[in-house]
Structures are given as structure tokens and as C-alpha cells.
Amino acid sequence: MDIRAAEISAILKDQIKNFGEEAEVSEVGQVLSVGDGIARAYGLDNVQAGEMVEFESGVRGMALNLEQDNVGIVIFGSDREIKEGQTVKRTGAIVDVPVGKGLLGRVVDALGNPIDGKGPIQSTERRRVDVKAPGIIPRKSVHEPMATGLKAIDALIPVGRGQRELIIGDRQTGKTAIALDTILNQKPGHTAGGDEKAKLYCIYVAIGQKRSTVAQFVKVLEDQGALEYSIVIAATASDAAPMQFIAPFAGCAMGEYFRDNGMHAVIVYDDLSKQAVAYRQMSLLLRRPPGREAYPGDVFYLHSRLLERAAKMGDAAGAGSLTALPVIETQANDVSAYIPTNVISITDGQIFLETDLFYQGVRPAVNVGLSVSRVGSSAQTKAMKKVAGKIKGELAQYREMAAFAQFGSDLDASTQALLNRGSRLTELLKQPQFSPLKMEEQVAVIYAGVNGYLDKLPVTKVRAFEDSLLSTLRSKHKDLLDSIAASKDLSDENAGKLKSVVESVAKSIG
């Protein structure tokens, strides 16, 4: 038999060339115990903190506790399919989510998977959920207004782009309503051909809420045409605690895409109390030592590292911004509990909502005395500064006098005038839901209030006066509104025109 060496080597070489099967090497461990959404695994010696791991059933988890002899893993989803003795493998990736404009108009879960039935997400970029906040040098101080469309907030507690403003109050005081109105108020900026700098993209993170509530919220956004520039991230009450814990970080990563690309975004965390509760549950099950109110020692760091990522970037970094509106729910107006005091100390001010005001019909139920913006008038336009400067002082005096006026009946004329003005200004700051006002319209309304044009009207007619003034301005004096909007200032000429319009409307109502 003739053995042809050249032929055999050619065949072998040919076969080796076509051999493309590469062995996949992955580090695996073994599940020691599982329960309550927490698994402990042996092995996984080189796993990183915060790394995504995968169980046999396809369920994913995140390694949080790296101990000497085992790894504590929180499970994203149900732990029913995970059994003791099963294998768990590293993925090598830290938890990340899809980001970009492809997410606009969508409802996703805490890991960025679509839950709205509209097909897969069109996104090419992914970002880690937990990254370091920008340093001191790339930032710039907050100087542009982030209009909420609510008179009580834009005039008295202005929020700027890049600010963190806390919305705090008991249940059912209208916290989500303020966030919703803020999102709806951004619609004019998103009209076709609008300036990218004027646009404000909105991200709403629902943490531990009822599914019906989230569905209702999404429906309002859809009906009002606001979903197209918004992203909704939902980790509802029935989702596992790790999903509720990670959702705000996932939302923040999506918001940072806009901030880092020279665009502007606002993110609402509704609410961080429930995130803290989910984190407490995870920490206690991982056997981390409890601290005050059984929260873990690093619950302050949990919220501070999240909220520090909201920032106004300097020109060198693209001049983008991410504004955060965290929501905290208090129990019986107790602002001195652990989580509320933590978040108040982290944020740049708070909007304090009160049940009593809400039931008195003052809506939005903002307690102007306890609410504050630590950015202040640098987040207002010149026009708003001119008219809103007075209103703060007058309302403060009114609150002080109203407390004394309960005791005495014989008040001198100046005190009576102050009380009259205060009650009318309070009435003026009321606003129905889903009716945000543009900056120039707010300026006109507040101008009428602080310059005494309402003092002669009965309090019951203040609402009618406001409606009449706005409809007159919109129909007959649109040029005046446009001029204030363009210059962002109330010039003497415009103030004169506005004065004559206000006087004629006051006459017709009075």
C-alpha cells in the first residue's frame, strides 16, 4: 500500500483550516442556598462586585456580597426555578442597560427590556447602571430655568437645569401630579424643527408602585402626546426587590446619555422611599448589619451616589444637563425620619406638599414657607425675577400676620390690606392639573397679583380674572407674550402694555 505523505498532510491541513469550533471557557459556581430572592453560591472566585451572573434556568442575578467562602447574589426575577446544587456562571459584564433616543416613547423594566408590547428596543449603545458622578471641573453652576409650568414652583421655588429638587409629602398630596405636569409642560419645546437646546427629554422611574397606577400615568402621557419625548422605567410592587433597587440607577444611565451628548433631560424618581425599603430588604437578607430604622449603614450613600449624577455640565463637556426630581413619601408629615432627612440634605432644595393644604383646595398643595430652592433666582428669567421678587416677601408677611389675625378682630388698615393681598395671591397660585402655563403667561398673571390689581376683586373672582386675562392676551395681544418670551425680560415698554391690558380686564371683571 502506497502512503502519500504530501496528500495526507494536505488533507489534515485542510481540515484544520476549517476547524472553527472554539471552546467557551466560563467560570462557574454552585448554588449553596436560595430563598427570598437571594442566592448564595460557592466558587465564582474572580467575580466582580456588581457583576451580572446567570443561573441554569436563564434567570440573571447580580453579585453583591463577596465573602471569603461564598458569594451573595440578588436575583432579578423569580427564584422559583433556581435549586440548590445548580450551576451559576459569570457573564463578565457589570449590570448595564440600553441607552439612546431609541428608548423614547417606550416603557421598559429595570434592565431595559421592553414591557409595552411594541417590539424590541432600537438601541445600539449600552451603559453601566452604576458609574461615578462627574467631577467638579467639568461642571458649571445652574443658570438656566427648567420650567415646570406651575406658577407656585416657577415663581417661588424655581428649579434650574442640572438641579436636584426634592418633592416631599404624605401619600395622596399630589407629588406625582407635579412631576406629570412638569413632563407635559415640555411639549412646546418638542414641536417640529425645535431647537435641540430648548428640548428637555423626560424620564420617569416608577419604583414599587401599583401596575394600574403606572398604566394610568402612561395613558395620560400618551393622550397628551408627551410619551414621544419620554422614557418610562417601571419596577412595580410585584417585581423583585433587586429590580426596585436597580431601576433608579438604570433610569439615571439613560438620562446621562442625553447629559453627556450636550442635550437636556429631567428624571423623576417616584419614589426613593420604596427604593430604600427594597435595599433594606436585600441588605438584611444578605446579612449586612442593620443601622437606624433597620436600614443598612450605606443607605445615605445609595441615594447620594444616585443624585450626584444629576449635573449641569460646562461648555467643554458639551453643556448638557440632567435635572433630578426625586420623590419621598413621608408618614404623617414626619420630615425628621431617616430617609427624608438624608435626601433633604443631598438635594438642592425641596418642594414640601401638605395634606391640610390639599384638602383646603390649595392645589398644588405647596407649603411655600417650608419649601425652598437652594439655586434660587439664578434659575429664573429676568422677567420672572422682576415680578416674583415681591411675591415671596408678601406671602411670608401674610403667613405671619394670618397667624396673629386669628386672635384679634380689630386690625389696622395696613395689616388688613396685607391679609387681603395675601389671600388673593394664595388664590392666584392655585392651578388645575394638566394646565401648565408658559413663562410669559405666568409673568403676566403674577404681575397683576403683586401690583394690586386683584385687591379690589372678591377672592372668588380671582380665578375668573386669571382666565379672562390669559384668553385676552392669547387672542388679542399675542405679540406682547411673544416679545416677553423672546427677550426673557419685562422691558418698560412691555410692562406699560401689560399694565393697560391688566387694567382693562380688571375693570371688566370688577
From Swiss-Prot:
Domain of life: Bacteria
Molecular function (Gene Ontology), one example: ATP binding
Reactions it catalyzes: ATP + H2O + 4 H(+)(in) = ADP + phosphate + 5 H(+)(out)
Coiled-coil regions listed in the entry: none
Location of the protein in the cell: Cell inner membrane
Gene3D superfamilies: 2.40.30.20, ATP synthase alpha/beta chain, C-terminal domain, P-loop containing nucleotide triphosphate hydrolases
Site location (Required for activity): 371
Protein's UniProt keywords contain Ion transport: yes
Family listed: Belongs to the ATPase alpha/beta chains family.
Protein name per Swiss-Prot or TrEMBL: ATP synthase subunit alpha
Record organism: Methylobacterium radiotolerans (strain ATCC 27329 / DSM 1819 / JCM 2831 / NBRC 15690 / NCIMB 10815 / 0-1)
